Regions:
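C-terminal non-catalytic interaction/assembly regions of soluble proteins
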Residues: 241-294, 300-304, 310-314
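Conserved phosphate-binding catalytic cores of ATP/NTP-utilizing and phosphoryl-transfer enzymes
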Residues: 40-46, 184-185, 294-301
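Short, structured coil segments at secondary-structure junctions
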Residues: 23, 109, 256-257
Length: 332
């Protein structure tokens, strides 16, 4: 988490530096070195994961108001009074991590964390905070309130998961008898009206002909997702053979998706143990019998989830990084 602290007085600056000593981040003082409240807030809203105002809540609220867009994209915002008595998360408490940050700040300076989200106030399971702790993407944030509302009303909430989850199941949660009954689901393949939490664990292995365009790769990926009912948000990176490291279309496709792409030599791919879909043609051209499956598994250091899929001269496969979810939804 990248943090940015803003103080307004010398006393506040001392506290900001103290906090940054334990919870690293940039430190600035409003009015010093030409720093204005509006400019600092505008810049840090884009570049930082968390903004910490050491001052009054009202100042922070007015500063961030023009920039607030979505609970899924807004950074965490916490306000700490300059005497370090209270730490108040005011934006992105769960998905952005502001509640956890307020608790961490409180632990450093002895403040009281002032947590006002309803699930925290009642000490009950917060599905969006759980998703963040399990490195999952929330596909339908508007459905969070439906799950939380049931728990707050002491109604049963049903879940389904495609992965074993360790630990004690939180109060009020019960496994769904059928997929249709689930209120939320931990899955790579969302279906139905549940709130879907998608683990960010996928690596897309890619093979393609020379000169393949980004548009062709995008169309192939869309077809791949449709074939498997896969949420595109599950993919976090791509991998291929080093023969493709200068392919403009491949690089542009990955850049547009925001994925890092890593390349491996034929020798590295050949050295990977396991059963993969062989191709004599690919063997002749690249020196290894399969590119997409091997590259995905090697990069993920995990297991093959979906095997080779061919479309318009493109081959794709999905491997998943090790994933061991538990029922923890807050930092200890």
């Amino acid at each position: 988490m990248t943090r940015a602290y803003l103080a307004f007085t010398e006393t506040g600056l001392v506290l900001a530096k103290r906090l940054a000593g334990s919870l690293p981040g940039s430190v600035a003082r409003c009015g010093q070195n030409g720093i204005s409240l509006a400019e600092w807030t505008s810049a840090q809203f884009v570049h930082s994961d968390a903004l910490i105002f050491v001052g009054a809540v009202g100042i922070a609220v007015r500063a961030i108001a023009p920039h607030c867009k979505s609970k899924t994209t807004d950074p965490a915002v916490v306000v700490v009074d300059e005497c370090g008595r209270f730490a108040v998360p005011i934006l992105s408490g769960h998905l952005g991590g502001a509640n956890d940050l307020a608790r961490a700040i409180a632990a450093v300076c002895g403040a009281v964390p002032v947590i006002t989200t309803a699930t925290d106030a009642h000490g009950i399971f917060a599905v969006d905070e759980w998703a963040k702790h399990q490195n999952c993407m929330v596909l339908e944030p508007e459905r969070i309130k439906l799950v939380s509302g049931k728990l707050l009303a002491e109604q049963p909430v049903y879940y389904r998961t495609d992965f074993p989850v360790t630990g004690t199941v939180p109060a009020g949660l019960f496994p769904a008898d059928t997929p249709e009954k689930a209120d939320f689901a931990l899955t790579l393949c969302p279906t139905g009206q549940a709130l879907h939490l998608v683990p960010r664990i996928g690596v897309l292995g890619i093979g393609c002909k020379r000169g393949t365009s980004a548009d062709t790769l995008e169309a192939a990926f869309a077809a791949f997702c449709t074939r498997h009912s896969l949420a595109a948000q599950a993919v976090t990176a791509a991998a291929s053979i080093d023969l493709k490291q200068n392919e403009p279309g491949l690089l542009a496709f990955c850049q547009a998706r925001g994925w890092p792409v890593r390349f491996y030599s034929a020798a590295q791919l050949r050295s990977l143990p396991g059963q993969f879909t062989p191709s004599p043609f690919v063997q002749r051209v690249t020196g290894v019998d399969n590119v997409c499956e091997r590259a995905a598994v090697l990069d993920a250091d995990g297991s093959l989830f979906y095997p080779k899929f061919a479309c318009s001269g493109v081959t794709l496969a999905l491997a998943c990084r090790p994933f061991a979810p538990d029922w923890r939804w807050q930092n200890a």
